[in-house]
Amino acid sequence: KAIEIDPKYAAAHYNKGVLYDKLLQHEEAIESLDEALKCDSGNVNTAFYRGIVFGKMKKHEQALNCFENIIRKHPKHMDAFFHKGIELAELGKHEKAIEIFDKILQIHGNNVNVVYAISRSNAAMGNIDKALYLLEQAIKKDRKTIKKWAIEDEFFDSLLDEPKFRKLVK
């Protein structure tokens, strides 16, 4: 209704995009977020959320571009840096992803999500001991969530037969 009254109401387009995302209607979410950005091109939250939705759609290059554009304009946007690392990992660029994650850890200490992200990239690269060590550190900080993520994460598929991995996630 708000969009009918004012088609240039960026917040209404953003909210519509969020709702579409929650309904797993990602193409429609992107369309609404694009409309929001047409109304308010400088809205960082909308641009960021657009990157998140592209990531959910497995459109990792587009997601990466969203996060890189945010970082160019807002070089201290740590969430954009983190998600840039995630998208690099999804594209198989694990060394670059780990470089980003290491920089975040230098600034923000032992963030459990970042430690987990480094673990999964190490698993994907075959650095089993390091992956398991970091996974163990992450599990110590957030047992329930990290175990669930690790079990479902394809980056850890190569570790499914590893006794230490099975022990960590049971």
Task: List PLM regions with ranges.
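Structural signature of tandem alpha-helical TPR/SEL1-like repeats
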Residues: K1, K22-E35, K56-N69, L91-K103, ...
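TPR/TPR-like (Sel1-like) alpha-helical repeat modules
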Residues: A123, I128-T145
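Terminal, low-structured helical/coil segments at or just beyond the last alpha-helical repeat
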Residues: T145-K170
